[in-house]
Regions:
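An extended, acidic
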Residues: 157-275
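Residue-level signal for inorganic ion chemistry
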Residues: 23, 49, 60, 100, ...
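Hydrophobic/proline-rich hinge and linker segments of small-molecule sensing/allosteric domains
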Residues: 143-148, 165, 169
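Short loop segments at secondary-structure junctions
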Residues: 63, 117-121, 131, 140-143, ...
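Generic detector of well-ordered alpha-helical packing
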Residues: 50, 73, 96-99, 130, ...
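N-terminal subdomain of lithium-sensitive/metallo-dependent phosphomonoesterases centered on the IMPase/IPPase/PAP
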Residues: 1-97
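DPxDG-like acidic metal-binding loop motif
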Residues: 84-145
């Protein structure tokens, strides 16, 4: 199964249309009944998430009727879909509103993510910023590109390697338990500056475009990471799980680090993740 250039254009249009029709009209316009907690007060779902995922899913089913479709919000109804990514002939993975906590709070740091996998390999990824209208598109073997709302396009490139005390990056330790949580958060004092966006879309956008040296996560849900990892790799970076093995569709544990190159990855693994 191959994905054509026309398919990529179609996927970009799907994401942008969902953002235009379902997400942005509800941004800073949510009622009390439009927001619900999933597992905690910081794990939310809104009507924008549900309706955007439904719109994208419907469009994908019409064009690719035999494909596996994995949506973050539909996952609770059928959790077998994530392991099935490991060998699905063709699959699409949707995060309709990545950064829902920010979205619900009225903070314009959220995105829509769509990844394409073929037989356990990510072959394309789209990360869209509904607020700015900008889109990152990554195609395996062809690079990663940022396309502005006005149509201007630039190829992405990761940051140059730097010494640890000059690095800017972030490790999401919210899903970690002690002692890992305390050790890693303390080790972040070794770098120049850290941050927390609470939004994988913008984190991968920043690290793939060279604005950050590294990012890391403990929880590996595919809608958060598949498209971003591909964009980072196509921009020249090195991404691997904490044990050094490649991150593959269907995997949800083991932690992940994205860095400018393998040497930088090993430095971060040793000095920041530790243990």
């Amino acid at each position: 199964m191959t994905i054509s250039d026309q398919d990529i254009l179609f996927l970009g249009d799907c994401v942008r249309e969902a953002a235009r029709a379902e997400i942005m009209p509800r941004f800073r316009n949510l009622g009390a009944d439009d927001v619900s907690e999933k597992t905690s007060a910081t794990d939310l779902v809104t009507q924008a998430d549900l309706l955007a995922e439904h719109r994208i899913t419907a469009a994908l089913k019409e064009r690719f009727p035999s494909a596996l479709i994995v949506g973050e919000e539909a996952y609770d109804a059928d959790r077998s879909v994530v392991p099935a990514l490991a060998d699905a002939e063709l699959a699409f993975v949707i995060d309709p509103v990545d950064g829902t906590f920010n979205f619900a709070a009225g903070l314009p740091v959220f995105g829509t993510i769509l990844a394409v996998t073929v037989r356990g390999e990510t072959v394309a990824g789209i990360i869209h910023d509904p607020v700015l209208g900008d889109t990152v598109t990554a195609i395996k073997g062809a690079g990663a590109f940022l396309t502005r709302q006005d149509g201007q396009s630039t190829k992405l490139k990761v940051a140059e390697p730097a010494s640890l005390n000059q690095m800017v990056g972030g490790i999401s330790w919210g899903h970690m338990e002690d002692p890992d949580r305390s050790r890693i958060s303390a080790n972040m004092a070794k770098i120049k500056m850290t941050f927390a966006f609470n939004c994988s879309a913008h984190e991968y956008w920043m690290v793939a475009s060279g604005k950050l040296h590294f990012i890391g996560h403990a929880k590996l849900m595919p809608w958060d990471h598949l498209a971003g990892v591909l964009a980072h790799q196509e921009a020249g970076g090195h991404t691997a799980k904490f044990d050094g093995t490649p991150y593959r569709p269907g995997e949800t544990t083991g932690g992940i680090i994205s860095a400018p190159d393998k040497d930088s990855w090993q430095l971060i693994r040793r000095e920041i993740i530790g243990n």
